[in-house]
Amino acid sequence: MKSITIKGSERESVGKVSTKALRNAGAVPCVLYGGNQAVHFSADAAAFKNLVYTPNAHTVVIELGKGKSFNAILQDIQVHPVTDKILHIDFFQLFDDKEITMEVPVKIVGTSKGVLAGGVLRLNQRKLKVKALPANLPDFVEADITPLEMGNKLYVTKVGKPEYKIMHPDNTVVAQVRISRAAMKAAQEAAKAAKAPAKGKKK
């Protein structure tokens, strides 16, 4: 999985006054969990643009100076309800020998036979939770829709790779090809046309 580097500074004070001062200065207060103790730090709000405002998934390298560096993933984010300004971010520390669960986007590949026949593709799951060692986290889960005929569904059991485990029930639908109104109407008209000669035929 691709990684984004966030350069920040450890916080000496974590009270409300210092937190408000940080935000007024254009910084975001953050906490890194998962290690022996929580690490409080802050970073410029602009540093999070490529991490937060994107449909893609990333791991994060947090650099706090003096040789302190941590690998992590974004765990939780708080934004202002009106301005969408980032108020606070929680991160979770990664360790090479410990599996982690996170959401990654679904990438559709291939051309469905059902779509070519007039069906409509519906993506039921835009993201899937996967569990893997940090080195095996995928940038996305590839979903090949090529075999899907009209009315078929693609389940999570048909996507993914051995390097990671998909954390959803086997009956979870990733994508499906629905019969479009146009295709349904055409089928109905074809059925009527097929019956017409039979009705008009005299014995």
From Swiss-Prot:
This is one of the proteins that binds to the 5S RNA in the ribosome where it forms part of the central protuberance. This is Large ribosomal subunit protein bL25. GO terms for cellular component: cytosolic large ribosomal subunit. One of its GO terms (biological process) is translation. The keyword RNA-binding applies. The keyword Membrane does not apply. Belongs to the bacterial ribosomal protein bL25 family. CTC subfamily. Disulfide bonds: none annotated. InterPro entries: Rbsml_bL25/Gln-tRNA_synth_N (IPR020056), Ribosomal_bL25/Gln-tRNA_synth (IPR011035), Ribosomal_bL25_b-dom (IPR020057), Ribosomal_bL25_C (IPR037121), Ribosomal_bL25_long (IPR001021), Ribosomal_L25_dom (IPR029751), Ribosomal_uL5_bac-type (IPR020930). SUPFAM superfamilies: Ribosomal protein L25-like. Gene3D superfamilies: Ribosomal protein L25, beta domain (2.170.120.20), Ribosomal Protein L25, Chain P (2.40.240.10). GO terms for molecular function: 5S rRNA binding; structural constituent of ribosome. Part of the 50S ribosomal subunit; part of the 5S rRNA/L5/L18/L25 subcomplex. Contacts the 5S rRNA. Binds to the 5S rRNA independently of L5 and L18. Keywords: Ribonucleoprotein, Ribosomal protein, RNA-binding, rRNA-binding. It comes from the Bacteria.
